[in-house]
Amino acid sequence: VLLYIDGQRADLFEDENIEMTLTTQNVKDISKVFGDYSNGFTLPASTTNNAIFKHYYNVDLLGGFTANLRADSFIEVNNNLFKQGVLELEEVQMKDNEPYAYSVSFYSNTTALKDLFGEDTLNDLDLSAQDHTYNDTNIEAGINGYVSGTDNAVIYPMITPVTRWYYDSQGSHGDGNIHYHNDPSHGVFYYDLKPAVKLQKIIDAIEAKYDIEFQSDFFASADFGKLFMWCHRRAGYMFKDQPIGATSELIELVSGDTVFDSTLHRFPVTASANPALISYSCTATASTNYRVDVFINDERFVSKEHTGPVSNVFVFLPALVAGDYVEMRLAPSGDGGAVTVGVFADWYADASGVTLLAATALTSAMTTAGVVTVSDQMPEQKVSDFIGSLIRAFNLVVVPTAPSTYDVEPLDDWYSEGTTRDISQYVDTEESNVKKAPLYRRISFKYNETEAILGEQYRLQNDIGYGDLRADFAFDGEEFEVEVGFDNMLFERLTDTYSNGVGLTEINVGQCITRELEPYIGQPIIFYAAGNLRIQLSNHWSYTDMNDAAIEKQDMWLIGNVNSSVATSVTKTLNFGTEIDPYLLQAFDDGLYKTYWKDYITDLYDASRRVFTFKAQLPLGVMVQLKNNDKLTILERNYIINSVKLNLTTGEASLELLNDV
């Protein structure tokens, strides 16, 4: 057995046994994907190993080995690559005040993924290819199609973050009425809508950031390509009524007197001229939001947010010295507009307060046309939790196939790719143990308990969340829960509240507000963009654009929990169990449980299912080729692997197997 750490071959004790546990899906915890790992073992404190671990025992050495980060590692058996992964240094054993041995553990690359992701969140990903200008052209394009320049990856779904939308074909006014009346005072306002990004692009960004590759027919599938995440980072609107978080840009003051540096666009401080205050005025349209920052020596001194024009805003400066400089910067809110800034500065010769001179400068108009930076709008969710939620929802298996490459497939597909191996000749068939599989008296599949108005009402009325599934069994076992870290939104097909109106409309929306009609944040919302809806003219709805014009609309995305806008074409849903779709108004049973979980759970609860334990002596060829999705044949009976404990030095193995049913 050979062990390599950060590319260097480590020394081993001659009598050291390294035992690996091989497991991916385990009946002891069916919601988790496991990775192969070793028992703890020791390495001698040899010259080679001391160099690898950089004399970790010596606290006086700087720049030493970082034990809280696992080191890249791989194991060879008789010069054949066995496993790639990471090695964790646990402790150094000392004897007579000298290092004797290093206690370590080895983990496969599946386990290492969580270390790689760390505490990073979705907004740490580079989604700049999906950034776009915040304007009517892009918003309207995204309502029923894709935003241009985003690689068909960004849409603007009909989900409201603040106002409770309804449809009243008689009433011409009323906050939230989206029926078209050629009146810009109500309807779907441009600032109501937030973008959504394809999950495939999030996966791509994860691969790029961490220099890994997911080899996955599942992630590349057409159905997965219809899944989007709503860019809902904070409760309320995306830009309107929100703190301005954009990075400010230097205001290029294009005219001014000699005290102002028109090349560097700043007020320099000299021995004879010390600024005491700055005042500024801004010309802007009434609806333009922006922030003015005053910087001293590249450090923000003060920030002020404004809407529309302002006059004579005073900023008193601290005592400055020669060599200091003052700059003005402007930050957009995201909703566009042009701002012209005029700046006036009083300069004093000394502390006596006698005015030496006054300096003025004026900008040309700076357009604050907002850009939607998609990463800034992503929900506050860890990358590891995002991947983990996908794994639990779709019962995915993540298996490393190379140092930075992972095979990601649903469990059933992964098992189907395994090889059947007859190992009867290597197994001690005279002695074995047989026991029942661990069973649970209740298995629950659930999303986050949403507080969005319709979802919470459904849960309170039915004692279970929309899309959740619960199964009870007559066993004296524990309860088991598979929980996904997303909100499963219950969408709404609007009904005309006018008694003589059109009745049930063709308009499908999401209401991301609470029962108290307050904005709601919750967990990230994912949904299918199942197709485009062309609505009858009698169901037309109103969009109020940035120019305060009411625009008649008949198109929108059908967003929801099913993968098609045509009932006969629905093959998948985001619900775990059978639910009535609020738009198509019929029940669909092709949910997550039936599609991705049912076969495994049904086999687990099959009356003939048993857990078998065998002892075996595996030759090198079998050890190296064995995969966790292989079927093992023993005396003409097939088994699937629950776990294998394998001594790499001796080839002795303890096989925990499930009979194939």
Language-model segments: residues:
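Polar, S/T/G-rich
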Residues: 1-259, 341-369, 374-391, 413-422, ...
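Hydrophobic beta-strand signal
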Residues: 74, 327, 632-633
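Glycine-centered tight beta-turn/hairpin loop motif at sheet-sheet or coil-to-beta transitions
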Residues: 78-80, 299, 634-637
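Short beta-strand-centered aromatic/proline hotspots
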Residues: 83-91, 637-647
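Extracellular jelly-roll beta-sandwich "head" domains, especially the C-terminal globular C1q domain
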Residues: 240-272, 277-365
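Bacterial peptidoglycan biogenesis and beta-lactam-recognition machinery
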Residues: 384, 392-401
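Minor-groove-contacting beta-hairpin "wing" of winged helix-turn-helix DNA-binding domains
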Residues: 405-410
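Extracellular low-complexity, Gly/Ser/Thr-rich intrinsically disordered linkers
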Residues: 614-618, 622-630, 635-637, 641
